[in-house]
Amino acid sequence: MASQGTKRSYEQMETDGERQNATEIRASVGRMIGGIGRFYIQMCTELKLSDYEGRLIQNSITIERMVLSAFDERRNKYLEEHPSAGKDPKKTGGPIYRRIDGKWMRELILYDKEEIRRIWRQANNGEDATAGLTHMMIWHSNLNDATYQRTRALVRTGMDPRMCSLMQGSTLPRRSGAAGAAVKGVGTMVMELIRMIKRGINDRNFWRGENGRRTRIAYERMCNILKGKFQTAAQRAMMDQVRESRNPGNAEIEDLIFLARSALILRGSVAHKSCLPACVYGPAVASGYDFEREGYSLVGIDPFRLLQNSQVYSLIRPNENPAHKSQLVWMACHSAAFEDLRVSSFIRGTRVVPRGKLSTRGVQIASNENMETMDSSTLELRSRYWAIRTRSGGNTNQQRASAGQISVQPTFSVQRNLPFERATIMAAFTGNTEGRTSDMRTEIIRMMESARPEDVSFQGRGVFELSDEKATSPIVPSFDMSNEGSYFFGDNAEEYDN
């Protein structure tokens, strides 16, 4: 992308940094990770968790959610102004699982938000450390991306459920800042914009008055974020049209859906980061590892190396397969929900199977589930190779894909040709090329028609041995192109419900 020079790196967004050099970035990301680790250790002490209980991913998620809720200012304010029955706006909590007499027991805990904020700040040199909070949000978002399909949400906004590869980050909260915006897929941004336009159509005051002015600024900002994800001039020009519209309505919704479809072939730039659960960072800090001094990167070898040496456990329901549970969490850790399964399999060193073939439900346990039959097992989160995470969609001058998911959004910068089902995608582009965006639409369709799946994306990038930390000798993997590449293929994943 031409504008690369003006952009802050994702690590800088992650740590609210101004321009920094690589060493400073590694140090500030390390500081953020260390803060999460220290906080987690302190929480385990407060809750008197054993080492095993502290490494249980379900306990980690509860603790992460508590601190995110404690700092959710908007919701806290709302809860105080609209008191609801049985909800104390000043408290936060969730299920903590303990091993008692050879059985797993659920205990619902409740803490003052003020107390949680104090522990968090104390672990982060007295600062609010928003970057660390965002990091945990992205981990939860990546876990949701690997666990659920967003079919219903896509259909509700008039999009096609087969566009699910564009939906990365669709469950990220609004307050996730620049780092959050960077990891959102094209479909996620389109969906947010469509929801906004629909509100404007239904509520005449939406764009009016002082509030309307703020709404308008938010709308234009979201348009610019989406525009920045596109890599071709015609797609960006269309985004300018959508942004400058006096009174956004159905024409803009049409344009946005058109752009989302076009992104299946002319892929957008979406960042990928390996965000790990707090129960990985905690024990590393406890063992004496100094993240700030050693430096850390979310897009290099560091997360792979950390997972090679980590022990994480998970509760397992009676008919779940622990290996499948491990795959789900591995994909979440590396933000690989929409990556080509062949690439993921090669890097992981064990076959990564489509979502529909997994015998596992989500990681979190509902409050009405029976604990009597719960078991626990070790999650296998190690990998055979590592690869650099990408922030682009691959070369856009782009074999078969499937009925479920008809494209991929690459996570790893690995040389391969990107599969897409041209006939399926192009079928969606019949008809409407008139109107004020006609020339751009025609241009985009022309580019898509001339795109060739055989063209290799990420020229010369490969995977690396775990001993090759400077990424000096790339291994370019060969893929069996007859295998199915998409994760949500012909799928029955559960829907994501708030």
Curated annotation (Swiss-Prot):
GO biological process: symbiont entry into host cell; viral penetration into host nucleus
Signal peptide extent: none
Post-translational modification: Late in virus-infected cells, may be cleaved from a 56-kDa protein to a 53-kDa protein by a cellular caspase. This cleavage might be a marker for the onset of apoptosis in infected cells or have a specific function in virus host interaction.
Motif residue range(s): Bipartite nuclear localization signal: 198-216
Motif (Unconventional nuclear localization signal): 1-18
Pfam families (alphabetical): Flu_NP
Residues in coiled coil: none
Composition bias type Basic and acidic residues, residue spans: 8-21
UniProt GO cellular component terms: helical viral capsid; host cell; host cell nucleus; ribonucleoprotein complex; viral nucleocapsid
Residue numbers spanned by region Disordered: 1-21
Alphabetically ordered keywords of this record: Capsid protein, Helical capsid protein, Host nucleus, Host-virus interaction, Ribonucleoprotein, RNA-binding, Viral nucleoprotein, Viral penetration into host nucleus, Virion, Virus entry into host cell
Molecular functions (GO terms): RNA binding; structural molecule activity
Localization in the cell: Virion; Host nucleus
Keyword DNA repair found: no
InterPro entries named in the record: Flu_NP
HAMAP family per the UniProt record, alphabetical: INFV_NCAP
Record function comment: Encapsidates the negative strand viral RNA, protecting it from nucleases. The encapsidated genomic RNA is termed the ribonucleoprotein (RNP) and serves as template for transcription and replication. The RNP needs to be localized in the host nucleus to start an infectious cycle, but is too large to diffuse through the nuclear pore complex. NP comprises at least 2 nuclear localization signals that are responsible for the active RNP import into the nucleus through cellular importin alpha/beta pathway.
Similarity comment text for this entry: Belongs to the influenza viruses nucleoprotein family.
Anything else known: South Carolina isolate has been sequenced from formalid fixed-lung tissues of a 21-year-old male which died in 1918 at Ft. Jackson, SC. Brevig Mission isolate has been sequenced from lung tissues of an Inuit woman buried in the permafrost in a gravesite near Brevig Mission, Alaska. This sample was recovered by John Hultin, retired pathologist.
Quaternary structure and interacting proteins, as annotated: Homomultimerizes to form the nucleocapsid. May bind host exportin-1/XPO1. Binds to viral genomic RNA. Protein-RNA contacts are mediated by a combination of electrostatic interactions between positively charged residues and the phosphate backbone and planar interactions between aromatic side chains and bases.
Name of the protein in its database record: Nucleoprotein
Organism encoding this protein: Influenza A virus (strain A/Brevig Mission/1/1918 H1N1)
